C-alpha cells in the first residue's frame, strides 16, 4: 500500500506543470510504479514510444491517414502506386473523449523522448494548455534515481 500512497510530489508537479520530463534509472520498473500511482489517483494512462510517432499533432489529436505495408502486392486501377490510405482514430483524442466520468484526466507517457525534436517538445508543452484534462510525461533519458523537471525547461534548453 505504501507504493500507491507515495509519489504525491510527482503528482503535484504533473498537475501544476501539465508536462514533465522524466529521468529514470535504466534498469526500468520506475515508470510502472509511477503509472500505478497515477491510476490510483484517478487518472487513465496511455504509454507509447516516441519513435515512429510521426507528426504528433496529427497522430495524437486528429483522424489521420496511414499506408499499411503492401506485403508485395501491387495496387491496380485508380489507387496511387504507393498504396491505399486507411484512416485511423487519434491516439489520444479518441480516448480523451471517452474518459470515464470519474476519471481526473488522461496521462500520455512517452518512452524514448530523447529522439524528439525541439519543435515536437514545444508542442508537448502546449498540449496540456490546449486540453486541460491531458497530462504529458516524457522519458528523456537515464539517471541514478527517478527525477523530473518541467518539460518547458527541457524544451528551452534543446
From Swiss-Prot:
Protein name: NAD(P)H-quinone oxidoreductase subunit N
Role summary: NDH-1 shuttles electrons from an unknown electron donor, via FMN and iron-sulfur (Fe-S) centers, to quinones in the respiratory and/or the photosynthetic chain. The immediate electron acceptor for the enzyme in this species is believed to be plastoquinone. Couples the redox reaction to proton translocation, and thus conserves the redox energy in a proton gradient. Cyanobacterial NDH-1 also plays a role in inorganic carbon-concentration.
Domain of life: Bacteria
Top enzyme class: translocase
EC number: 7.1.1.-
Catalytic activity line of the entry: a plastoquinone + NADH + (n+1) H(+)(in) = a plastoquinol + NAD(+) + n H(+)(out); a plastoquinone + NADPH + (n+1) H(+)(in) = a plastoquinol + NADP(+) + n H(+)(out)
GO molecular function, one term: quinone binding
Keywords recorded for this protein, A-Z: Membrane, NAD, NADP, Plastoquinone, Quinone, Thylakoid, Translocase, Transport
Complex formation: NDH-1 can be composed of about 15 different subunits; different subcomplexes with different compositions have been identified which probably have different functions.
Similarity comment: family membership: Belongs to the complex I NdhN subunit family.
Gene (name only): ndhN
Topology in membrane: Peripheral membrane protein
Subcellular location: Cellular thylakoid membrane
HAMAP family to which the protein is assigned, alphabetical: NDH1_NDH1N
Gene Ontology cellular-component annotations: plasma membrane-derived thylakoid membrane
Major subcellular site: membrane
Amino acid at each position: 500500500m505504501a507504493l500507491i500512497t507515495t509519489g504525491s510530489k510527482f503528482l503535484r508537479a504533473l498537475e501544476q506543470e501539465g508536462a514533465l520530463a522524466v529521468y529514470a534509472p535504466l534498469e526500468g520498473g520506475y515508470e510502472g510504479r509511477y503509472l500505478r500511482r497515477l491510476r490510483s489517483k484517478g487518472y487513465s494512462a496511455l504509454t507509447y514510444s516516441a519513435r515512429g510517432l510521426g507528426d504528433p499533432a496529427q497522430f495524437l489529436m486528429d483522424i489521420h491517414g496511414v499506408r499499411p505495408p503492401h506485403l508485395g502486392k501491387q495496387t491496380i486501377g485508380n489507387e496511387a502506386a504507393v498504396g491505399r490510405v486507411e484512416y485511423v482514430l487519434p491516439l489520444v483524442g479518441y480516448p480523451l473523449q471517452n474518459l470515464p466520468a470519474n476519471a481526473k484526466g488522461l496521462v500520455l507517457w512517452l518512452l524514448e523522448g530523447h529522439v524528439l525534436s525541439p519543435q515536437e517538445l514545444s508542442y508537448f508543452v502546449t498540449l496540456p494548455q490546449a486540453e486541460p484534462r491531458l497530462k504529458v510525461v516524457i522519458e528523456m533519458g537515464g539517471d541514478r534515481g527517478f527525477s523530473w523537471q518541467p518539460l518547458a525547461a527541457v524544451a528551452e534548453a534543446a
